[in-house]
Structure formats: structure tokens, C-alpha cells
Amino acid sequence: MPSTLKINVTENDPYAIYFQEGKSFLIDLDGSIITEINLNNYEDDLLFVRGENSPELLEQLIRDISIAFPNLTQTLEEVEFIEKRRWNLKLNNKLLVKLPDEKIQQSLKNLKQLFEEQEVMESNIIEIDLRIQGRAALKVLDGKINYGIDEI
């Protein structure tokens, strides 16, 4: 049909702001870049994403979190893909969680158990390092302690 024009419109819902080489981009959950933005003029409260290859892996991370510790997604402020192999999570209370390269869901289940047993969000814990399977190293404002978590 010579006088017919077909237009396909795909709407991408902004899920996060991705930082790369000094620029900021709106991305959707599957990591597709929607548009470059000026962060000073943007007011939505979206997740910050950093690290090489992080947009492509974001959806799997969010899926793992949603399965193992669903409430955690509500407190995520920033995620960073470290050295192309593992994630750091920063929560809205500035708590840093270091995930391992493998068995992320199990580590997130352990984190959930720690949150349920301790008042982590209200404590002076500033970092939880889960990079060693079955263990959580806690860093507090006035020193460092270790807390063992049995596998679930």
C-alpha cells in the first residue's frame, strides 16, 4: 500500500540513572538507554547504576533481589558493578552491602536473615561484606566486628 505509513512506538519506562564517562543516562529495567539527561534538572527518585556492563546485568540483579529479599528493592539507592564480576549495593541509609561474584541469591537470603535478626537499618553498621560465602563481615562506625550466618 503506497499511501500507508506504519509506525511502531515502543515506550521505555525509566528505571534507573546510569553513569558512564561523566554522563548520565535514563535506562529501563533491561538496561536499554532511553536518553541522556542532565542530572541537575532531573527530579525523579530513581536507582543510580554504575560500573561497566551494569545496565545489561541490572535486570538479573533486581530479579535476584526480588526473589531472595523483596523488601530490599525499596531501600536501594545505588548499585555498582565492580570489576566486571560482582555488585555493591548502597541503601538509602548509606549502608554498603558487598555481594560475592557467585551465589548471589544465597547471599541475599543470608542478608535478609541478618536484617530479620538484627536491627541493621537502625544500627551503626555502615558496611556488610558478604563476599565470603556463609559469612558476613560487619563494619560499624567505631570498629569492625564479624557475625557468622549459617546457610539457609
What are these regions (language model features)?
Residues 1-152:
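Charged, solvent-exposed interaction patches on well-folded alpha/beta domains
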